[in-house]
């Protein structure tokens, strides 16, 4: 199987022949594929779009395709395509150093944001050499699954019926008369029993049955088998799309991340995949969501604890406000959910992340819809400043725009355009501290603090 890496917004070009040597040509920003694999990938992606009605991962054009902002892994027979984010303006060569650093940064962002289905301990375990983002994510998922399963399997009470030698629960009179008229030592009962056959355990086992057939490093396959052995008493149930998700509560919420990842794996495999065949699957993440969740989680963990009295609310949690009110239905319309709200001492800062590349020609001017959105936040949350946060790009500087109201042009607040560097090694203490300082500066400015809190890199 040919394994290649391409960067977000990079090009996939159709080669002139079917030889695998074609893939040696180019860089992760401009990748040439053998013609047969290119055609197969295009057919697979186009049919997937038509069948599921989802947005395009690759924008197909004449003899080449342009990768969008979805990152992860696409596998078809003969090809595994890894898509990594483009985090800076560097022109990466074919060498593995740049690709490996980008891959590790993406893993850090996924783990921090919760999409990697692991907590902080997972970061230290992501040491698979030359592994794709798919292998690393699966390894992290299995570490988390094993951690939770060793604490205890998910269990719930289920109603069971049976012809028992002892009376248990409620006697079902109709069945008792029919079945046991001549067997007075038997009791047909309906009772509640504590069982490990729950939707969560079934979904975990379904996911591991799929993973055990994939080409994974042996250390990862060992973990898959460990999970399957723990779930040995859980029955094998075929996976069907559209089944309702379980209700998560305080008893089982620790499984929510691994359940979500299991659903992603199962829903990403091809509908016609068969045991023992080369599998077709996708495992993709929208970088806009990855960036949003990463920044929110990072700010909560690394910045807010250093600002006395500050509170952060991701996705407006606990403070979603409608922009309109319907007097007939007596309810709000169009609830606003800012990516991150930071409050302190009566002041409010709204942060909205955007995984976009602003144009140098327009001097870092946000799009009209983004400005309208931030103006609505200023108005509805009664704040003096709302900030758009983008990944850093060379030759672009921060800027402020005064929002106006009324004919007299009174100032309604300030919309800031700020940038953070996510191309530095985020997995290192220094990279972590650099990002924390940059975000602390932005938040302190938005809250009107005289100086940002000190952030030191661990020794």
Briefly describe each language-model feature range:
Residues 2-281:
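Residue(s) in the substrate-gating loop at a strand-loop-helix junction
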Residues 1-46, 278-459:
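Catalytic core segments in nucleotide and nucleic-acid processing enzymes
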């Amino acid at each position: 199987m040919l394994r290649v890496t391409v960067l977000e917004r990079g090009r996939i070009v159709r080669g002139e022949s079917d030889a695998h040597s074609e893939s040696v040509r180019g860089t992760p920003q401009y990748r040439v594929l053998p013609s047969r694999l290119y055609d197969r990938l295009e057919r697979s992606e186009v049919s997937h779009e038509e069948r599921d009605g989802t947005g395009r991962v690759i924008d197909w054009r004449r003899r080449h395709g342009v990768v969008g902002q979805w990152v992860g892994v696409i596998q078809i027979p003969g090809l595994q395509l890894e898509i990594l984010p483009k985090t800076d303006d560097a022109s990466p060569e074919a060498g593995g150093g740049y690709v490996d650093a980008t891959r590790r940064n993406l893993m850090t962002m996924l783990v921090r944001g919760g999409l990697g289905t692991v907590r902080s301990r997972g970061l230290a375990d992501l040491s698979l050499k030359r592994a794709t983002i798919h292998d690393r994510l699966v390894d992290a998922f299995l570490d988390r699954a094993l951690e939770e399963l060793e604490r205890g399997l998910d269990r719930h009470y289920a109603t069971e019926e049976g012809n028992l030698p002892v009376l248990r629960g409620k006697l079902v009179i109709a069945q008792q008369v029919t079945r046991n008229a001549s067997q007075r030592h038997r009791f047909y009962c309906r009772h509640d029993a504590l069982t490990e056959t729950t939707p969560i355990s079934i979904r975990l086992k379904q996911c591991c049955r799929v993973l055990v057939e994939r080409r994974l490093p042996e250390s990862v396959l060992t973990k898959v088998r460990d999970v399957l052995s723990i779930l040995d008493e859980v029955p094998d149930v075929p996976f069907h799309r559209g089944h309702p998700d379980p209700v998560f509560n305080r008893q089982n919420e620790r499984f929510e991340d691994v359940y979500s990842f299991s659903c992603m794996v199962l829903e990403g495999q091809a509908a016609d995949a068969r045991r023992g065949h080369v599998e077709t699957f996708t495992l993709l993440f929208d970088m806009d969501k990855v960036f949003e969740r990463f920044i929110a989680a990072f700010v909560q963990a690394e910045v807010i604890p250093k600002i006395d009295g500050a509170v952060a609310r991701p996705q407006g949690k606990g403070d979603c406000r409608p922009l309109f009110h319907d007097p007939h239905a007596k309810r709000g319309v169009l609830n606003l959910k800012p990516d991150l709200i930071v409050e302190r001492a009566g002041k409010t800062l709204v942060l909205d992340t955007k995984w976009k590349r602003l144009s140098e020609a327009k001097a870092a001017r946000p799009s009209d819809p983004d400005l309208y959105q931030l103006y609505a936040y200023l108005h509805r949350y009664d704040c003096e400043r709302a900030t758009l946060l983008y990944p850093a790009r060379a030759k672009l500087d921060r800027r402020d725009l005064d929002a106006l109201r009324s004919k007299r042009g009174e100032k309604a607040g300030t919309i800031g355009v700020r940038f953070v560097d996510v191309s530095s090694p985020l997995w290192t203490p220094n990279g972590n501290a650099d990002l924390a300082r940059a975000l602390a500066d932005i938040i302190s400015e938005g809250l009107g603090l005289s100086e940002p809190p000190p952030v030191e890199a661990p020794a």
